[in-house]
């Protein structure tokens, strides 16, 4: 009996490991580093590139949490196919996949993985956040809040978003591992959704000062994140925000939300800032 967590030392996987361990769940942390130590978990070196390694990790697991890393789309598609192949062979009891905000209704790696899980015959759920609050911790964003009392982000002023945090994802993963009756897509995020000025207002209320929203272009976003994640992934991120600019909103649908399906309400922006110690 164990729960297998991909990216266990990363931004999204680490909170899942911590949440499951705190709940007394036996955790197997998958990492690329065979010498990595993950508190509260047994560590196994296994990457998305080896189907055999994934099969070995998934076999007899009570639950598997997967999400695709921020690499090239070509690599993401390869990883998606490998995950599906391993799930079909190993037959874990339940799989939870976080799209990390990527759409699943059009082509791409996230869509391919969601479709593959749906056709695998294995119990599964797909967590669908929109945008992560952790994006706002990028130096370009949070430093501007601190130094200029402005919150820069590549969305329109009137564009509402159902923000979610990695901590919220971890809470939902824990619940879904105990609720195999909840399958299909589970949307995770604040509802009602917040516009840019409302988000800036939440930052201002937390820090005790007036913070204004500052819309920037996807190209400005690309330039700001490239030193952190690399030019290729940064270009992909900019493309996502460019495509997003044509949409009316990124609000979750309340009918398939974690609030309705699991009784879990995501943190407010202020609660999240407090929980991460800012």
Predicted regions and their residues:
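Oxidoreductase cofactor-interface core, primarily capturing Rossmann-like NAD(P)-dependent enzymes
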Residues: 2-37, 49-55, 59-61, 68-78, ...
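Active-site regions of enzymes building and remodeling cell-envelope glycoconjugates
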Residues: 39-47
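Short, basic/glycine-rich phosphate-binding loops at helix/coil junctions
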Residues: 63-66, 252
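Conserved N-proximal alpha/beta basic substrate-recognition cap immediately N-terminal to
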Residues: 81
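A hydrophobic C-terminal alpha-helical subdomain
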Residues: 219-278
